[in-house]
A protein has these predicted regions:
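Active-site neighborhood of HAD-like aspartate-dependent phosphohydrolases
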Residues: 1-54
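A generic "structured core" feature
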Residues: 14, 22-24, 105-109, 147, ...
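A metal-dependent, Asp-based hydrolase signature
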Residues: 48-97
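Short, acidic loop-to-helix structural element flanking the phosphoryl-transfer center
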Residues: 85-90, 94-127
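Acidic, Mg2+-coordinating phosphoryl-transfer loop and its flanking beta/alpha structural elements
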Residues: 184-207
Length: 207
């Protein structure tokens, strides 16, 4: 199939709709200048995300006591650092959700966004599937209208498992009422989005 022959495009966010490398570089400069006290928390938070993914891939279930993997990641970080989870959440939301917005818009993948708009204009169905909260970032990109469905960790309709588990993409297809075989997953990580797509019996396009 060519891209236009799919009924739905299911799209990753971070590193896919914008160039993550440049956003991270800009945020690293901001952290050094204005947020040194947050660096330890953010480093541990990112470590816990990859640790959770590795545990999940090894067949160990993520803790079911949390509302979402995102909530579990916050709790694990707080436990490791010996601080209240509310402190961790405040730092994470400020430095990973809110402040990057101004840079995300500048480094948007404009060609891909134009393709998405064209696909939707032709009647295609679209979903955003993310391992992190997405609402603020899609507003920064100005692309909310592009997506029929948003499936984001830590938000309503969010998955209970992280990629490469296919749950998020399968849930998006279900909400769109499109069969998995008619879906194209678009993402920047073959080891996460690609593996999830293959497990869901969907096609995959690496950006």
């Amino acid at each position: 199939m060519t891209d236009a022959q799919y009924d739905a495009w299911l799209v990753d966010l971070d590193g896919t709709l914008y160039t993550q490398r440049w956003v991270r570089l800009a945020m690293a400069v901001e952290l050094v200048l204005f947020g040194r006290s947050a660096i330890k928390t953010l480093r541990q938070f990112r470590h816990e995300h990859e640790a959770m993914r590795e545990e999940q891939n090894a067949g160990r279930a993520l803790a079911a006591t949390h509302a979402s993997p995102f909530a579990g990641q916050l709790a694990r970080t707080a436990e490791k650092l010996g601080v209240p989870v509310t402190d961790v959440e405040r730092v994470v939301r400020r430095w990973m959700v809110e402040r990057p917005g101004k840079w995300i818009g500048r480094f948007a993948r404009k060609t891909l966004l134009a393709e998405l708009r064209a696909f939707k204009a032709q009647g295609g169905r679209t979903a955003l599937v993310s391992d992190y909260p997405a609402e603020r970032k899609i507003d920064a990109l100005g692309v909310r209208a592009i997506f029929d469905v948003i499936v984001a960790n830590g938000e309503a309709n969010g998955p209970r498992r992280l990629k490469p588990d296919p749950e998020g993409y399968l849930h998006a297809a279900e909400l769109l009422k499109v069969q998995p075989g008619r879906c194209l997953v678009i993402g920047d990580r073959d080891d996460a989005d690609g593996e999830a797509a293959r497990a869901a019996k969907m096609s995959f396009r690496l950006v």
